[in-house]
C-alpha cells in the first residue's frame, strides 16, 4: 500500500512519516474488510524511495504491531508509483 488517502486520491501530506501512517491505515482497512488484523500479519516488505527514510518509517512501523514483529524485508527502490516515498505490502495468515 502506498500512502495515498483513498478519500482524496492524494498522498498524505508531509513526508515519509505521514505516508507510512497512511499506508498502515489503508492496510488496516483492507485487513479488517477481509476479517484479519495486524496480529495476523506474518511478513512485510517495505519499499523506500530513499533508504535515509528508514528510521522515520521504522518509528511508525514499530507502533503498528503488538508482541513479536512479523518477518520483514526493507529495500530501496529507484522509484515508486506516483513518486511515493514508501510502499508496504503485507502477508496475513489466520491461525
Cite the ranges covered by each PLM segment.
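Short, polar/acidic, helix-capping and beta-turn segments at strand->helix junctions
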Residues: 1-95
Amino acid at each position: 500500500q502506498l500512502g495515498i488517502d483513498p478519500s482524496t486520491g492524494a498522498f498524505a501530506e508531509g513526508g515519509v512519516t505521514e505516508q507510512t501512517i497512511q499506508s498502515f491505515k489503508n492496510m488496516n482497512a483492507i485487513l479488517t474488510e477481509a476479517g484479519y488484523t495486524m496480529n495476523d500479519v506474518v511478513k512485510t516488505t517495505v519499499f523506500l524511495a530513499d533508504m535515509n527514510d528508514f528510521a522515520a518509517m521504522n518509528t511508525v512501523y514499530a507502533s503498528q504491531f503488538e508482541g513479536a514483529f512479523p518477518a520483514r524485508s526493507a529495500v530501496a527502490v529507484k522509484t515508486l508509483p506516483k513518486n511515493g516515498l514508501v510502499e508496504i505490502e503485507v502477508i496475513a495468515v489466520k491461525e
